[in-house]
From Swiss-Prot:
It comes from the Eukaryota. This is Insect toxin PlIT. Belongs to the long (4 C-C) scorpion toxin superfamily. Sodium channel inhibitor family. It comes from Parabuthus liosoma (African black tail scorpion). GO terms for cellular component: extracellular region. Keywords: Ion channel impairing toxin, Neurotoxin, Secreted, Toxin, Voltage-gated sodium channel impairing toxin. Has the structural arrangement of an alpha-helix connected to antiparallel beta-sheets by disulfide bonds (CS-alpha/beta). Binds to sodium channels (Nav) and inhibits the inactivation of the activated channels, thereby blocking neuronal transmission. Causes prolonged contractile paralysis in C.partellus larvae. It also has significant toxic effects on B.fusca larvae but not on mice.
Length: 14
């Protein structure tokens, strides 16, 4: 999304 560290399986570098 914004480039924040991937914490969730659906919140990676998208």
């Amino acid at each position: 999304k914004d480039g924040y560290p991937v914490d969730n399986a659906n919140c990676k570098y998208e």
